[in-house]
Structures are given as structure tokens and as C-alpha cells.
Regions:
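NAD(P)-dependent Rossmann-like dehydrogenase/reductase catalytic/cofactor-binding core
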Residues: 78-80, 86-125
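C-terminal substrate-binding/catalytic lobe of Rossmann-fold NAD(P)-dependent oxidoreductases
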Residues: 1-95
Length: 125
């Protein structure tokens, strides 16, 4: 996770600490994420920013016990984000919970996207 984050973001200076845990769920990946931003963001600002990002769905209504859960992500090409809250241990810190269907968002979706690019850019000429 550490190396992948730096590689995907193209920035070796990104500091990541990760712990991986395998739990018995049918499918899906879940992550507890803690970030520190350059400037202070309120949880509401973070929700608004994330809600505009392609492929992200904010599911964050603690009053109604609505949080991202692997079962809710199943069968979707979306990453669900919720439990967005301030991290009081960092000046500009936020915590949130992320879930996704790893079959759709992982290898299967990547394979389809690669095939689409091959067809569009190389096979339809």
C-alpha cells in the first residue's frame, strides 16, 4: 500500500503507514484512512470535494447510521467514502472510511478499461 500510493500519485515524498488485515467478508476492500492536508479542511468541505470526484459516492449520515459497508459497494463501480471526521491528533488531519468492490474496482474493471483503450486506440484504425 505504501509503494502503490507513492507510485500512483507519482510522489515518493508521500508518507504512508499501512496495516493490512484480512477479514471474512464475501468480497470488498475497506480502509480506514487518515490524511493530513496542506490547509485545514472541515469534514463538510471534505464531503463536498469528495462528492464531486468521479467514481466516489459519499455515504456519511451518522444520525441515521449510514456508513460505507462492503455489502453496499458490491456490484458497483464506485468507491464509497464516509465517517469523515476531524483527526484531532494532527493540525490539518482528517479520518474517513473507504469501501469498494475489489472485483469491479480492481482487476475486472482494470481489464475492461485496458480492453476499451486497446479497441479505441489500436484496433479501430
Amino acid at each position: 500500500m505504501v509503494n502503490e500510493t507513492q507510485k500512483i500519485m507519482g510522489d515518493d515524498s508521500i508518507q504512508v503507514t499501512a496495516t493490512t488485515v484480512r477479514v471474512p467478508v464475501f468480497y470488498g476492500h475497506s480502509e480506514a484512512v487518515n490524511i493530513e492536508t496542506e490547509r485545514k479542511l472541515s469534514p463538510d468541505e471534505a464531503r463536498q470535494i469528495l462528492a464531486k470526484a468521479p467514481g466516489i459516492k459519499v455515504v456519511d449520515n451518522p444520525a441515521k447510521n449510514e456508513y460505507p459497508m462492503p455489502l453496499d459497494a458490491a456490484g458497483q463501480d464506485l468507491t464509497l467514502v464516509g465517517r469523515i471526521r476531524e483527526d484531532f491528533s494532527l493540525p490539518n488531519g482528517l479520518n474517513f472510511w473507504v469501501v469498494a468492490d475489489n472485483l469491479r474496482m480492481g482487476s475486472a474493471t482494470n481489464a475492461v478499461q485496458i480492453a476499451e483503450i486497446l479497441i479505441r486506440d489500436y484496433l479501430r484504425k
